[in-house]
């Protein structure tokens, strides 16, 4: 935040780092580096906190650990409850209860926006049937090997923003030997492979939230080294098509949580 100008913080109950993040944010506020309004804080109700009572307590815990009166974005982290089978019908009922809690907390001012994470098209379609307040976003894994075409189309049709985590395929897509086209395009555009993958997501209308614990990489992700060509595109049509074709060439690959089996 102090060196790279980071203003978006993505955390979750299950990450167990909210207290440290809250302390760092308040230190930056105290030192005059940022104001609370400058920082966009996202947190998530965990699979251990599904259902009316647990979700309400979960939100209280998030605010307490972060030391804030509100978060800018509050998400349901996962469409199933912990310790329930993925195929249990109880998951749908607990999702609905949890969403009602998020709607209430939005009304109370404890969250500025609410959304979901790791929801499939079926989960979103079900949610939209009963939601009084529509989810602002769905945070999911999305990259050229797992492009989420159907989900992106559904979200676009229903006004739900897709937010991509794991834009680098858990780091696998940065392997030049395994996926040479990413690095070839990086050489053509005179930027890093990571910047190519982030730009691919942005060109698809997806928000990207790369993470790193390495200061140099954090700076790299935010730099504008990828310049637009004479046609105004940051990736040429041919370059984008090469990236789009990776899932067909190598087979779709999912590296993170898979919610496809959750009822």
Residue map of PLM features:
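Acidic (Asp/Glu)-rich catalytic clusters
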Residues: 2-3, 22-36, 63-68, 128-131, ...
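Beta/alpha (TIM)-barrel catalytic core signal, keyed to glycine-rich beta->alpha loops juxtaposed to Asp/Glu
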Residues: 79-263
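Glycine-centered flexible beta-alpha turn that most often forms the glycine-rich phosphate-binding loop
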Residues: 9, 71, 114
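Active-site mouth loops of central-metabolism enzymes
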Residues: 44-53, 85-91
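A short, structured active-site edge motif that brings together acidic residues
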Residues: 35-49, 73-79, 141-142
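N-terminal binding-site loop/beta-alpha segment at the start of enzyme catalytic domains
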Residues: 1-39, 169-171, 262-263
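CE4/NodB-like, metal-dependent polysaccharide N-deacetylase domain
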Residues: 55-76, 104-108
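Short, acidic/polar
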Residues: 1, 51-66, 122-125
């Amino acid at each position: 935040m102090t060196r790279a100008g980071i203003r978006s913080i993505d955390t979750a109950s299950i990450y167990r780092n909210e207290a440290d993040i809250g302390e760092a944010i308040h230190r930056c506020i105290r030192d005059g580096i940022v104001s609370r309004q400058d920082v966009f804080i996202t947190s998530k109700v965990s699979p251990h906190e599904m259902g009316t009572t647990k979700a309400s307590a979960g939100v209280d815990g998030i605010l307490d650990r972060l030391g804030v009166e509100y978060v800018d974005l509050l998400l349901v982290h996962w469409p199933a409850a912990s310790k329930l089978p993925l195929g249990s019908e109880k998951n749908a009922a607990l999702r609905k209860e949890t969403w009602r809690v998020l709607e209430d907390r939005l009304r109370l001012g404890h969250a500025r926006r609410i959304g979901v994470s790791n929801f499939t098209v079926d989960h979103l379609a079900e949610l939209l049937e009963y939601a009084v307040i529509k989810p602002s976003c769905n945070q999911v894994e999305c990259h050229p090997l797992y492009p989420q075409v159907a989900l992106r189309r559904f979200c676009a049709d229903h006004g739900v923003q897709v937010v991509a985590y794991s834009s680098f395929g858990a780091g696998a897509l940065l392997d030049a030997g395994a996926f040479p086209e990413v690095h070839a395009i990086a050489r053509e555009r005179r930027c890093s492979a990571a910047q190519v993958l982030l730009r691919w997501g942005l060109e698809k209308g997806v928000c990207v939230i790369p993470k790193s614990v390495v200061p140099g990489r954090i700076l790299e992700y935010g730099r504008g080294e990828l310049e637009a060509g004479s046609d105004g595109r940051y990736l040429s049509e041919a370059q984008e098509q090469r990236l789009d074709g990776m899932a067909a060439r190598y087979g779709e690959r999912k590296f993170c949580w898979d919610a496809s089996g959750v009822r």
